[in-house]
Amino acid sequence: MSDTPETGKPAAGTKPAARTEAKAPPKSARRRSRELALQGLYQWLLNRNDIGAIQAHLHDAQGFNKADSEHFDALLNGAVREEARLTAAFEPFLDRKVEELSPVERAALLVGSYELVHCVDIPYKVVINEAVELTKTFGGVEGYKYVNGVLDKLAAQVRSAEVAARR
């Protein structure tokens, strides 16, 4: 393709070059389950609606068929059932009151905390990275940094042997 020297625009009769944008890799079933669990926890944290109704609604959501439904159910139900225990685990690492966290950050911390405590087959770095990615996607501009810091400190406490072996 030749550009006209005066304008830098494509010469008459030529087509502009097609843009080649890198296509994002498909989301894993576990990533989708985490996204849906975060959305469910967000709804629950805001309204305290019946978790069964929220879960049923999300099971019917577009794209749920591509999620790991067992992992989703475990994350959503486990985080709600153990909210007080999980919050008590990460609360010492907060620089503010739990009530001052955004609902997205709080939901991401609950998902990440649940996985750190109960999903020991998932490496702690993966758990933290997934929570960070959730916060980047659904949260505020800098929230992911906060979630990263809190979960990193929690991982050192609840998975001390794994963290020590990797550092």
Swiss-Prot record:
GO biological process: DNA-templated transcription termination; transcription antitermination
Signal peptide: none
Transmembrane segments annotated in the record for this chain: none
Alphabetized InterPro entries for the sequence: NusB-like_sf, NusB_fam, NusB_RsmB_TIM44
Gene Ontology cellular component list: cytosol
Chain spans, region Disordered: 1-32
One Gene Ontology MF term: RNA binding
Its job: Involved in transcription antitermination. Required for transcription of ribosomal RNA (rRNA) genes. Binds specifically to the boxA antiterminator sequence of the ribosomal RNA (rrn) operons.
This protein's name: Transcription antitermination protein NusB
Taxonomic source organism: Cupriavidus pinatubonensis (strain JMP 134 / LMG 1197)
GN (gene name): nusB
